[in-house]
Amino acid sequence: MGLIDYRALLIDCDEVLVDRDSGVWSALQPLLDNAPRAPDRDVVMAGFEAVIGTLYPRFDELGFSGLLCFAHRHLAERLGIRTSWEEGMTFARSVPNWTLFEDAPGAMLYLRKFYRLLVYADRDLQDRGLLCERLGLEPDSLLSLTTHPLDDPQWLAEMDLDPGETLRVSRPPAKALSDGGLCLIRRDRAQHRQPCAADICISSMADLVAQHQLSLRR
C-alpha cells in the first residue's frame, strides 16, 4: 500500500514525537554527578532501556512514575551509585519536562487532515492531559500498550480500526500490526546506512509530511 492509502496512523510517542532520551539523560544528571567517573551516554541509556524492559511487566502495579522511580534505583545499582527513593521520585516527575521534537506539532497538525491519529504513550493520569494538549489530541486518542496491545483484535474492532488500513509509525525495532503497514523513524544518521526494515523509512516527522505531499502529487 502507498502512504496515502492508509486511513489511520498509530504513532509511538516516545522517540517519535517526544525526545524521551534527551529528557531522561538530563534528569539523570544529578545521579551521574555522583559517579566515580563520568559514564558514557550510550552505556547509561542502554542500561536504562534494560532496566525498563525488566520492570515493564509491573506497569499496571507501579504506574509510569513508579516504573521510572524503580528504573532510577536499578540503574544506580548497575552503575554502583548510591541514591535515595526521593531522588528516584524527582527523576520520575521529570516526564512533563520532556520536550517534543521540533517537527512534531506541525506534522501532527498536517497529518490529522488526512488520517485518524492515535498515539501510544505510557503516562500517569495527571500527565496525559498536558501531553494531549501539546500534541493537539483528544484524550481518547492517547493509548497505552498495556491496555491496547498490538495483537489484540478486540480493541481494534471496538475502535473501528482495520489493521490492514493502519500504518504504525515507530522506531526500530518495532513491528507492524498483524497485516498493517510499518513506518520506521530513523533520526540517527548511522541508521540510514542500514537497509530499511519497514514499508516506509523516514528521518523525521517532517520527512513523513514531505513524503505524503509527494505521494499526493503523483
Model-flagged regions — what are they?
Residues 1-7, 109, 120-218:
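Asp-based, Mg2+/Mn2+-dependent phosphohydrolase catalytic module
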Residues 53-89:
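A metal-dependent, Asp-based hydrolase signature
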Residues 1-47, 78:
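Active-site neighborhood of HAD-like aspartate-dependent phosphohydrolases
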Residues 31, 103-114:
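Catalytic-core regions built around general acid/base machinery
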Residues 22-26, 102-106, 130, 196:
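Generic recognition of short, well-ordered alpha-helical segments
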Residues 47-48, 91:
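Short alpha-helical scaffolding segments that buttress acidic/His motifs in well-ordered protein cores
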Residues 89-98:
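Surface-exposed cleft-lining segments at the edges of enzyme active sites
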